[in-house]
Amino acid sequence: MRYLSLPILLFSSLFLTACGPAALIGAVGSAVTRTAYENDAKVNDYSQPAGPRNTLEVALANLKLGIGYMNEGLYEEALEKLNRAKEAEPDYPPTYNALGVLYQKLGVYDVAEANFKIAIKLNPADSSTLNNYGLLLCQSQRFEEADEIFMKAANNPLYATPEFAYSNAGTCALNNEQTELAENYFKEALRRNARIGPALIQMSELSYEQEKFMPARDYLSRYLDSNKHSAKSLWLGIRIERELGDKNAVSSYELLLRNQFSESEEAKLLSQAL
C-alpha cells in the first residue's frame, strides 16, 4: 500500500499566497454542520450576496467554507461555496486548485485536470497546485508527467515545503516500480524535513522489503515520534519485530492492531498469519 500525502498538501498550503501560512482552514470537529459553517462565515458576512463587498473578500470567505466542507466530506456544499468563490473572483488561482481537488475526490478526473490547468495558467509558480496536479497525474498512471510536475514544484525556491513534492514523487515512482528512484526521492524529502511521515513510513516499508530490518525499525520509530499508529504502521511493526525476534514488541503491536483496528485488512492478515 502506497501512502500519498494529498490532504496535507491541499490544506496546509492552499492559502499561502493569499493569506499567509497561518490561514489554514481545517476540520472543526466530527459533527460539523452546514449551520455551524454558515455562522462562522457570518462573522464578517462575506459569504452572503447582499450589499457591496470586496470581491476578493467574498471569494476568500467562500473558498474557506468550501475547503471546510470538503474536509468534512460534504462535497455538494463544498462545490456550492467554491463556485460562489469563482463567481466572485474568476481569476483567483486557489479556487481552481480547490476545485481540482474536489473533482478528483469525486472521481471526475477530466474536470479536475481542467481546473488544475486553469490554476497553473493563472499562477505558474504555485507549487501547491503543481503538487496536487501531480497527484492526479500519478493516480491516472501518467507517471512521467507526474514526475515532471512534482520536480517543478520541488525546485521552486519560494516553495516552503518541497519535502511534500519529493515524498509524493517517491510514492509515484514506487507505483511505477522504480524503487531506486523512489528511495532517492524519499531520502531527499527527509533531508529537507526529517519528520515527514509519508517518507518515513515508505522508507520503513522499503527497508523491510530489502531485509534491512534495523533501518526499517528506525524509520518506523521516527515515524511514530510524530504520527499516530495506523493499521498499516502496526502491521509493518509486527512484521519487522518478528524478523528481529522481539516477541514483546510483536505482542504489543498485535494487541494494538486487534483492539484499535479490529475490522481492518491488516487485522485480517494477522489472523491468517497465526
Identify the function of each model-found stretch:
Residues V58, Y92, D126, A160-P162, ...:
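Residue-level recognition of tetratricopeptide repeat
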Residues K64, N97-V101, N132, Y166-N168, ...:
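Canonical tetratricopeptide repeat
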Residues N54, A88, L122-N123, N156-L158, ...:
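Structural marker of alpha-solenoid helical repeat scaffolds
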Residues L24-A31, Y37-A50, Y223-L274:
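Terminal, low-structured helical/coil segments at or just beyond the last alpha-helical repeat
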